[in-house]
Amino acid sequence: MKSFCVKAPAKINLFLHVVEKKETGYHLIEGLFVFANLSNFLEIKVGEKDFRYDNPIVEFVNSELKISNKYNTVMRAVNLLLRHAPVRTKVTVKVVKNIPTSAGLGSGSSDAGAVIRTLGKLWKIDRPILNEIALSVGADVPASIDSKPVLVRGIGEELCYINKFSLPTNIVLAKPKKKFLSTPEVFSKYGGNFSKPIEWRDDTEKDLLKLLKETENDLQEIAISLVPEIRDVILALESQEGSILSRMSGSGVTCFGIFDSEENAKTAAVNIREKQPEWWVCDAQLIV
């Protein structure tokens, strides 16, 4: 029996544009994905080749929402990976949830990415196959394999990694408690005012703040129409000392604020938590 304890970090969309809708119904996006040191923890156990093969076992702990143990991103990822395993074996995964679910932070996608990264390395599965598996599990999963700052395009399959990250890494995450949004629901209400693809130049990485001020989250207003408290969260983040930029991540409901120092970020989190005890609030650092 081999056992692995791995982290699955929260995903944050610094900007997110919807650029096209295909006839298949898929939306093509463009966005800057980053990851934070707020993580779910996974314990992955793999039986030796003489172990009886069985369906994977997946258990979730500490989740705000009830997650099916049979129909989830981790189960899908493991089942697809097992097709490429060198031997038939038994896999069990225990996921301790610290990242809010259905909240725009890629909690399920990051779990799947961590499983693909870990078992892919163990079983020496080629990276192109891992990328295919990741994309079949979800649009955010390919970027979640490496969990590095990355410009994402298409339906999640086009990845351009950021070599020089020119932003402060101090952030605060906040969301109204017991508020959740379904990604398909939010996208289904997108009206079709598509954004033009950004012009990524050689010097764009040198001033990512300028890029962020020229971009936005195209899903933010739709999410606010469904959960109006999102606007209050953004305003609360913007009003704190040292705030540089605040907006919603993904399809919501979590919002992020970038701060000029770790001290100001921690103070902002305390202030918001005191004024809004019903919100979930967390200060964190981006992984760069």
Swiss-Prot record:
<feature type="active site">
    <location>
        <position position="11"/>
    </location>
</feature>
<keyword id="KW-0067">ATP-binding</keyword>
<dbReference type="InterPro" id="IPR006204">
    <property type="entry name" value="GHMP_kinase_N_dom"/>
</dbReference>
<keyword id="KW-0418">Kinase</keyword>
<dbReference type="InterPro" id="IPR004424">
    <property type="entry name" value="IspE"/>
</dbReference>
<dbReference type="InterPro" id="IPR020568">
    <property type="entry name" value="Ribosomal_Su5_D2-typ_SF"/>
</dbReference>
<dbReference type="GO" id="GO:0005524">
    <property type="term" value="F:ATP binding"/>
</dbReference>
<dbReference type="Pfam" id="PF00288">
    <property type="entry name" value="GHMP_kinases_N"/>
</dbReference>
<dbReference type="GO" id="GO:0016114">
    <property type="term" value="P:terpenoid biosynthetic process"/>
</dbReference>
<comment type="pathway">
    <text>Isoprenoid biosynthesis; isopentenyl diphosphate biosynthesis via DXP pathway; isopentenyl diphosphate from 1-deoxy-D-xylulose 5-phosphate: step 3/6.</text>
</comment>
<comment type="similarity">
    <text>Belongs to the GHMP kinase family. IspE subfamily.</text>
</comment>
<protein>
    <recommendedName>
        <fullName>4-diphosphocytidyl-2-C-methyl-D-erythritol kinase</fullName>
        <ecNumber>2.7.1.148</ecNumber>
    </recommendedName>
</protein>
<dbReference type="GO" id="GO:0019288">
    <property type="term" value="P:isopentenyl diphosphate biosynthetic process, methylerythritol 4-phosphate pathway"/>
</dbReference>
<keyword id="KW-0414">Isoprene biosynthesis</keyword>
<dbReference type="InterPro" id="IPR036554">
    <property type="entry name" value="GHMP_kinase_C_sf"/>
</dbReference>
<dbReference type="InterPro" id="IPR013750">
    <property type="entry name" value="GHMP_kinase_C_dom"/>
</dbReference>
<comment type="function">
    <text>Catalyzes the phosphorylation of the position 2 hydroxy group of 4-diphosphocytidyl-2C-methyl-D-erythritol.</text>
</comment>
<dbReference type="Pfam" id="PF08544">
    <property type="entry name" value="GHMP_kinases_C"/>
</dbReference>
<feature type="binding site">
    <location>
        <begin position="100"/>
        <end position="110"/>
    </location>
    <ligand>
        <name>ATP</name>
    </ligand>
</feature>
<keyword id="KW-0808">Transferase</keyword>
<keyword id="KW-0547">Nucleotide-binding</keyword>
<dbReference type="GO" id="GO:0050515">
    <property type="term" value="F:4-(cytidine 5'-diphospho)-2-C-methyl-D-erythritol kinase activity"/>
</dbReference>
<feature type="active site">
    <location>
        <position position="140"/>
    </location>
</feature>
<dbReference type="InterPro" id="IPR014721">
    <property type="entry name" value="Ribsml_uS5_D2-typ_fold_subgr"/>
</dbReference>
